[in-house]
UniProtKB/Swiss-Prot annotation:
This is Uncharacterized protein MJ0347.1. It comes from the Archaea.
Amino acid sequence: MKTIVIDKSMSVDIEYSINAIDQCNITSLKDLQIQPFDQCIILWNDKIIFRGYCIDARLSQSFGQQQYEYTINSPLWILSQQKTTAKTTFLQIFLKECCNLCNLELDYQLDSNPLIYIEESSYFDALKKCILYTKNYNTRFYVDYEYNSLIFTDKISGQHPKEEKVVGYEFEWDTEIINQVRW
Protein backbone atom coordinates (compact mmCIF):
# COMPACT_ATOMS: atom_id res chain seq x y z
CA MET A 1 0.00 0.00 0.00
CA LYS A 2 1.45 3.36 -1.06
CA THR A 3 0.43 6.65 0.46
CA ILE A 4 -0.10 9.82 -1.55
CA VAL A 5 -0.20 12.91 0.64
CA ILE A 6 -1.75 15.91 -1.03
CA ASP A 7 -0.23 19.12 0.23
CA LYS A 8 -2.83 20.79 2.43
CA SER A 9 -1.67 24.31 1.63
CA MET A 10 -1.99 23.70 -2.11
CA SER A 11 -5.12 21.61 -2.34
CA VAL A 12 -7.51 22.48 0.45
CA ASP A 13 -7.56 26.28 0.51
CA ILE A 14 -9.72 26.99 -2.52
CA GLU A 15 -9.17 30.72 -2.08
CA TYR A 16 -5.83 30.24 -3.84
CA SER A 17 -5.19 29.34 -7.44
CA ILE A 18 -4.61 25.66 -8.15
CA ASN A 19 -2.55 25.30 -11.29
CA ALA A 20 -3.05 21.82 -12.74
CA ILE A 21 -5.01 20.02 -10.10
CA ASP A 22 -2.51 17.20 -9.70
CA GLN A 23 0.53 19.47 -9.47
CA CYS A 24 -0.18 19.88 -5.77
CA ASN A 25 1.26 16.44 -5.10
CA ILE A 26 3.49 15.81 -8.09
CA THR A 27 6.48 15.27 -5.81
CA SER A 28 4.72 12.45 -4.01
CA LEU A 29 3.78 10.80 -7.30
CA LYS A 30 7.27 11.07 -8.73
CA ASP A 31 8.94 9.72 -5.60
CA LEU A 32 6.49 6.86 -5.18
CA GLN A 33 6.97 5.50 -8.71
CA ILE A 34 3.37 4.31 -8.73
CA GLN A 35 2.60 1.56 -11.22
CA PRO A 36 -0.73 0.42 -12.67
CA PHE A 37 -2.79 -1.63 -10.22
CA ASP A 38 -0.72 -0.52 -7.24
CA GLN A 39 -2.77 -0.23 -4.09
CA CYS A 40 -2.72 3.24 -2.62
CA ILE A 41 -4.40 5.60 -0.23
CA ILE A 42 -4.78 9.31 -0.86
CA LEU A 43 -4.59 11.59 2.15
CA TRP A 44 -6.11 15.03 1.84
CA ASN A 45 -6.25 17.43 4.77
CA ASP A 46 -5.10 14.64 7.08
CA LYS A 47 -7.93 12.30 6.13
CA ILE A 48 -8.22 9.41 3.70
CA ILE A 49 -10.30 10.38 0.66
CA PHE A 50 -9.48 7.31 -1.42
CA ARG A 51 -8.31 3.78 -0.77
CA GLY A 52 -7.99 1.46 -3.73
CA TYR A 53 -6.11 0.58 -6.89
CA CYS A 54 -4.57 2.91 -9.46
CA ILE A 55 -5.33 1.83 -13.00
CA ASP A 56 -3.54 3.52 -15.87
CA ALA A 57 -0.69 3.18 -18.34
CA ARG A 58 2.51 5.16 -18.08
CA LEU A 59 2.41 8.65 -19.51
CA SER A 60 4.37 11.86 -19.28
CA GLN A 61 3.05 15.34 -18.65
CA SER A 62 4.93 18.61 -18.62
CA PHE A 63 4.49 21.22 -15.95
CA GLY A 64 6.26 24.51 -16.68
CA GLN A 65 9.85 23.82 -17.69
CA GLN A 66 10.10 20.40 -16.06
CA GLN A 67 9.02 17.02 -17.35
CA TYR A 68 7.61 14.45 -14.95
CA GLU A 69 6.73 10.85 -15.66
CA TYR A 70 4.33 8.90 -13.53
CA THR A 71 1.51 6.43 -13.85
CA ILE A 72 -1.57 8.24 -12.64
CA ASN A 73 -3.69 9.62 -15.45
CA SER A 74 -3.11 13.37 -15.27
CA PRO A 75 -5.06 15.35 -14.30
CA LEU A 76 -7.99 13.02 -13.63
CA TRP A 77 -6.38 9.95 -12.06
CA ILE A 78 -8.73 7.18 -13.06
CA LEU A 79 -9.14 5.16 -9.92
CA SER A 80 -10.94 1.87 -9.40
CA GLN A 81 -12.55 1.54 -6.01
CA GLN A 82 -12.11 -1.60 -3.98
CA LYS A 83 -15.15 -3.87 -3.62
CA THR A 84 -17.01 -2.17 -6.48
CA THR A 85 -16.77 -1.88 -10.23
CA ALA A 86 -17.41 1.85 -10.06
CA LYS A 87 -14.90 4.36 -11.28
CA THR A 88 -14.33 7.93 -10.18
CA THR A 89 -11.79 10.65 -10.90
CA PHE A 90 -9.60 12.91 -8.86
CA LEU A 91 -11.33 15.98 -10.26
CA GLN A 92 -14.66 14.74 -8.93
CA ILE A 93 -13.08 13.89 -5.59
CA PHE A 94 -11.68 17.41 -5.49
CA LEU A 95 -15.04 19.03 -6.20
CA LYS A 96 -16.79 16.76 -3.73
CA GLU A 97 -14.27 17.64 -1.04
CA CYS A 98 -14.64 21.34 -1.76
CA CYS A 99 -18.40 21.03 -1.43
CA ASN A 100 -18.00 19.11 1.81
CA LEU A 101 -15.77 21.84 3.20
CA CYS A 102 -18.47 24.38 2.40
CA ASN A 103 -21.41 22.15 3.43
CA LEU A 104 -22.80 22.10 -0.10
CA GLU A 105 -24.45 19.40 -2.15
CA LEU A 106 -22.80 18.27 -5.37
CA ASP A 107 -25.39 17.52 -8.02
CA TYR A 108 -23.64 15.39 -10.65
CA GLN A 109 -25.90 14.52 -13.55
CA LEU A 110 -24.68 11.61 -15.65
CA ASP A 111 -25.21 12.62 -19.24
CA SER A 112 -23.21 13.18 -22.40
CA ASN A 113 -22.75 16.72 -21.09
CA PRO A 114 -22.93 16.23 -17.33
CA LEU A 115 -23.51 19.30 -15.19
CA ILE A 116 -22.42 20.13 -11.71
CA TYR A 117 -24.62 22.83 -10.25
CA ILE A 118 -23.38 24.85 -7.30
CA GLU A 119 -25.97 27.10 -5.71
CA GLU A 120 -24.06 28.88 -2.96
CA SER A 121 -22.49 32.13 -4.14
CA SER A 122 -19.76 32.05 -1.48
CA TYR A 123 -18.37 28.78 -2.83
CA PHE A 124 -18.88 29.84 -6.42
CA ASP A 125 -16.97 33.08 -5.88
CA ALA A 126 -14.08 31.13 -4.40
CA LEU A 127 -14.19 28.67 -7.27
CA LYS A 128 -13.81 31.47 -9.80
CA LYS A 129 -10.35 32.10 -8.35
CA CYS A 130 -9.21 28.54 -9.01
CA ILE A 131 -7.29 27.73 -12.15
CA LEU A 132 -7.60 24.12 -13.29
CA TYR A 133 -5.77 23.83 -16.57
CA THR A 134 -3.76 21.32 -18.56
CA LYS A 135 -2.85 22.36 -22.08
CA ASN A 136 -2.71 18.86 -23.57
CA TYR A 137 -6.31 17.87 -22.88
CA ASN A 138 -9.43 18.69 -24.81
CA THR A 139 -12.41 18.43 -22.48
CA ARG A 140 -13.65 21.58 -20.84
CA PHE A 141 -14.69 22.47 -17.36
CA TYR A 142 -16.75 25.67 -17.48
CA VAL A 143 -17.83 28.21 -14.94
CA ASP A 144 -21.14 29.72 -16.03
CA TYR A 145 -21.40 33.05 -14.25
CA GLU A 146 -24.98 33.81 -15.25
CA TYR A 147 -26.40 30.50 -14.02
CA ASN A 148 -23.93 30.09 -11.16
CA SER A 149 -22.99 26.59 -12.22
CA LEU A 150 -20.05 24.38 -13.04
CA ILE A 151 -20.27 22.63 -16.39
CA PHE A 152 -18.30 19.64 -17.65
CA THR A 153 -18.44 19.21 -21.39
CA ASP A 154 -16.56 17.63 -24.24
CA LYS A 155 -18.63 19.68 -26.73
CA ILE A 156 -17.29 23.21 -26.82
CA SER A 157 -17.67 24.72 -30.29
CA GLY A 158 -20.94 26.62 -30.43
CA GLN A 159 -22.65 24.25 -28.01
CA HIS A 160 -22.80 26.54 -25.01
CA PRO A 161 -25.32 29.39 -25.31
CA LYS A 162 -23.33 31.73 -23.07
CA GLU A 163 -19.84 30.96 -24.28
CA GLU A 164 -18.72 34.56 -23.94
CA LYS A 165 -19.55 34.47 -20.23
CA VAL A 166 -17.82 31.25 -19.27
CA VAL A 167 -14.24 30.30 -18.56
CA GLY A 168 -12.98 26.99 -19.91
CA TYR A 169 -10.46 24.71 -18.30
CA GLU A 170 -9.16 21.79 -20.31
CA PHE A 171 -9.33 18.15 -19.27
CA GLU A 172 -9.36 14.83 -21.02
CA TRP A 173 -11.67 12.00 -20.13
CA ASP A 174 -13.19 8.90 -21.58
CA THR A 175 -16.95 9.27 -22.03
CA GLU A 176 -17.52 5.63 -21.18
CA ILE A 177 -15.68 6.08 -17.91
CA ILE A 178 -17.56 9.27 -17.08
CA ASN A 179 -20.84 7.47 -17.62
CA GLN A 180 -19.82 4.87 -15.02
CA VAL A 181 -19.16 7.41 -12.28
CA ARG A 182 -20.69 6.60 -8.91
CA TRP A 183 -20.37 8.34 -5.59
